[in-house]
């Protein structure tokens, strides 16, 4: 899917039908909207975004969130807030796909980025 030029979209529905590890939906000057899907037993991968705040909105599945030194259960309907510079990781501990949409401020990924799998994301030279 190409980036959207529409400013209103059914994002929860889009997230529930997404099977890609990462798909950038919209990129603005100061923020970015991204769909993600984490397979059963998978994880986003521990990381820190210096200079980027991130909000993650979970629409399907369940898992564990680690933000800083705190670990919490997450499930559909939850939001996780990750301030700039804070270590974080999200693991799918349920059955089936864990799906979410996330916002970055400012943008974190190249506009139009798509990764079918986490391995694709790790192999992308534009990802750090």
Language-model segments: residues:
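A short, N-terminal "cap"/entry segment at the start of jelly-roll beta-barrel domains
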Residues: 1-31, 45, 115-128
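Conserved short histidine dyad/triad with adjacent acidic residue
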Residues: 19, 34-49
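Short, charged/polar surface micro-motifs in flexible loops or helix N-caps
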Residues: 29-31, 40-43, 62-64, 106-110
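A generic "binding-loop/recognition-motif" signal
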Residues: 31, 40, 51, 70, ...
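Histidine-centered metal-chelating micro-motifs
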Residues: 43-45, 64, 80, 84-90
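Glycine- and acidic-residue-biased ligand/ion/polar-headgroup-sensing regions
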Residues: 52-63
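Short acidic-glycine-tyrosine-enriched beta hairpin
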Residues: 70-84
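Ligand-binding loop in jelly-roll beta-barrel domains
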Residues: 84-110
């Amino acid at each position: 899917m190409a980036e959207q030029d529409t400013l209103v979209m059914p994002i929860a529905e889009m997230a529930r039908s997404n099977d890609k590890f990462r798909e950038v939906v919209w990129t603005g000057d100061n923020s970015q909207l991204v769909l993600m899907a984490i397979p059963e037993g998978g994880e986003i991968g521990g990381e820190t975004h210096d200079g980027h705040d991130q909000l993650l909105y979970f629409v399907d599945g369940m898992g564990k969130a680690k933000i800083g030194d705190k670990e919490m259960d997450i499930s559909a309907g939850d939001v996780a807030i990750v301030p700039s510079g804070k270590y974080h990781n999200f693991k799918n501990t349920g059955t089936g796909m864990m799906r979410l949409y996330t916002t970055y401020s400012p943008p974190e990924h190249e506009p139009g980025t798509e990764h079918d799998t986490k391995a694709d994301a790790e192999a992308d030279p534009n990802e750090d």
